[in-house]
Each structure stands twice: as C-alpha cells, then as structure tokens.
Amino acid sequence: IAFDNIEADDNLKAVIISGVGRGFCAGADLSSGKDTFNPSFDTFGVKEDDFRRDAGGILTLRMYKFLKPIIFACNGPAVGVGASMQLAGDIRIASEDARFGFVFANRGIVPDACSSWFLPKIVGISKALELTFSGRIISSHEALDISLISSIHKSENLMNEAINITQELIDKSAPISIAITRQMLWRSYSQSDPYDAHVIESKAMDSRGASDDAKEGVNSFLEKRSAMFKNKITSDMPDFFPWWKESN
C-alpha cells in the first residue's frame, strides 16, 4: 500500500528505506521456535492456485514494478529477508556497522523475496551461491567489494548521504524518463536478445522525443537554466507502457 500511495503522488520523486535503531532488519522472528517457518503460522503469505506466495517476494515484486528510484540505506545488521529485500532496490548504501547475511540454508529453508533472481545479477552466480550455501555474515566492506552496496558511510552521516545521492538522481531528470529507464534496465535482465531492448528503446525515444519534457530539456540546456519538467507519471506515461505482461 505504501508503494502504491507513493507512486500515485507526483510530488514524491523517490523512496529511501532504512532501519530504526542499531539494526536494519534481523529477518524472521524466531520466537515461535520450531514452528517459525511452518506455513500454518504464516499470517503474511498469500494463497494462490497451488502454492502459498512468499510475503517477501510479494514485496520485492512490487518494488520491481515501481516507477521511482528506491534507495536502501542499511544502518546495521540485515539478515534473512532483511538482506534479500534490499536486492530489489536500485542503489544500496550502508553504514560501517552494517552486516549482511543470507542465512536461509542455516535455518533449513531457502532464499526468499525473489533473491534467487536478484542476487546472482548483482554479485554474480558463484558469489551468490557461496553466500547462500554458507549463510555467512559479511561486513559492509566485503559487501562493497562484491558490489552488493555502492558505498560505506559513518552511521551518523548515512541518512544525509542517502538524501544527497537521491537528490543527484532526481533533481535534474524528468520523472517519466526515470520511470521508463528504470523498467527498461531492470527488465532487460530477462531479455534473451538485445533486439528486444532496441524495440522498447525505439518506442520510448519516439514517445519521449515528442513530449513537452524533451522540448524543456533542450531549451533549459540552451538557456543555461534548470529544467522544469511538467509531464507526470500519473497521467502522461506513453501509450505503449507497460510493454510487458503484468504479473501479480
């Protein structure tokens, strides 16, 4: 619901997600003991046809379809779904105190939140397998080395840095251009041929090239001023969008 509301408000340009206190998210609450992962005790999963949908996957799939930048500012330990949910973000930064653990196999379960799709694309298949097989906790510095995160910051500076990064993403760019670009790049992961990307890029170039935003982008450059893009995500997306078959 939160992502729906943000997407419906043209005044909101991006999302920053962080934790409260010393940790980001420690994953599942293990207080139920041996019944922690029993489907009968899961109040968040959704039944669909012949299977029960993982709640983490429902969240990351909504993030995947989101039309605005998502930035994670990991302020502390992120374990289980606390780590896997961040993979659907566009940019992840972390504090020096952050830790990441894909500990699912250690608990006798498997990766959730579509992380078997996201993680190999971010860190590579071999590193993804190593992290999920072993479940070992990695530091923010190792996370940076494997491109799981983009940068490390002092805890007291983390949110300010996240805001600065976000402003760099959105301040000079047209919201609709960002929305289409986000979907083009994410969805190109599953395309088998660059021609598929060429088709969408061509349609998008034609649509955007004829838009008021494109005129404003050129005029603002020539006039050496900041652009004032007026096209809105809620009302001015191109006719060919979405170009993919919608899933739940």
Q: Which sequence ranges carry the predicted segments?
A:
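Conserved CoA-thioester-binding segment of acyl-CoA-metabolizing enzymes
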Residues: 1-20, 36, 239-248
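Short hydrophobic/charged patches on amphipathic alpha-helices used for structural packing
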Residues: 3-4, 60, 83, 206
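C-terminal long alpha-helix characteristic of the crotonase
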Residues: 5, 93-98, 149-200, 206-216, ...
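Generic structural signal for alpha-helix termini and adjacent loop/cap motifs
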Residues: 9, 36, 211-212, 224
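Glycine- (often His-adjacent) and acidic-residue-rich active-site loop
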Residues: 11, 19-62, 78, 108, ...
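Crotonase-fold acyl-CoA enzyme core
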Residues: 61-176, 211, 215
